[in-house]
Amino acid sequence: MYLVDTIDYQKICCIIKTFEDNILFQKNYHSTWFLKSIANIQKEKYNYGLEVAFVGYSNSGKSSIINALTNQKKLAKISRTPGRTRLINIFSVTSEIRLVDFPGYGYAQVSRSISKKWKEMIFQYLNIQKCLQGLVIITDIRCPIKEIDELVINLAVSLNIPILLLLNKMDKVTRSIQKSKLFSTREKMLNFSNNINVELFSSFKKIGIHKLQFVLNNWFSSDKKLCQ
């Protein structure tokens, strides 16, 4: 039997398509544009296309990660005062694909009522948004996973929403701490689900961008049904 007879052409075509999709989406991420800011997700939610939401504690670096992903320094405005951003910012990757950036939760200088409102807004969004394809939760690698993070994770798991947990600011710690924190966080996530993806990230050093793009590409893949 010749070697050519053993080639899995279907698998090769699948690999080529995945590669082409990655190239396409990379270009799209770099041309992402700001769509709008909203205060009430229930009144202004979208009923078409696909979305991925970014959530995390204040000062975890959400805006910096979106800027790194899109290769645009000023797309997502970075506030010098953590907790300052109080609106949901929506960015369009294409006419059918969106990134949703929520206000950071839990900052001490924000009143309890506002902090509670933000948490309720996230929980409400996870429950009602049928276009949501995945949730990116961002944490500071130097800080432990907080209670609010666990509440969001629990809700997302119960709703079968895919999760990517990014340990951001990895450049702030040593390699040994990076490995230790990555291992311990992955172990902890097993208490919630076997399908939570945990990765290291540094928006400053631009480390982890390709892994983030790969996960988003999978969530936004062409075989996913568009919300209508």
From Swiss-Prot:
**Keyword Nucleotide-binding (UniProt):** yes
Its cofactor is:
Mg(2+)
InterPro entries in alphabetical order: G_ENGB_dom, GTP-bd, GTP-bd_ribosome_bio_YsxC, P-loop_NTPase
Indicate which residues the UniProt annotation says bind Mg(2+): S63, T85
- Keyword line: Cell cycle, Cell division, GTP-binding, Magnesium, Metal-binding, Nucleotide-binding, Septation
Record domain EngB-type G: where: 48-222
Q: Name one GO molecular function term.
A: GTP binding
Q: Which residues make up the binding site for GTP?
A: 56-63, 83-87, 101-104, 168-171, 201-203
What is a biological process (GO) this protein takes part in?
division septum assembly
Coiled coil residues, start to end: none
Q: Name one GO cellular component term.
A: cytosol
Pfam families per UniProt: MMR_HSR1
Top-level taxon in the UniProt lineage: Bacteria
**What family classification does the UniProt entry report for this protein?**
Belongs to the TRAFAC class TrmE-Era-EngA-EngB-Septin-like GTPase superfamily. EngB GTPase family.
Name the job this protein performs.
Necessary for normal cell division and for the maintenance of normal septation.
What name does this protein carry? Probable GTP-binding protein EngB
Q: Which species does this protein come from?
A: Buchnera aphidicola subsp. Baizongia pistaciae (strain Bp)
The lineage, from the top, is: Bacteria, Pseudomonadati, Pseudomonadota, Gammaproteobacteria, Enterobacterales
Question: What is the gene name?
Answer: engB
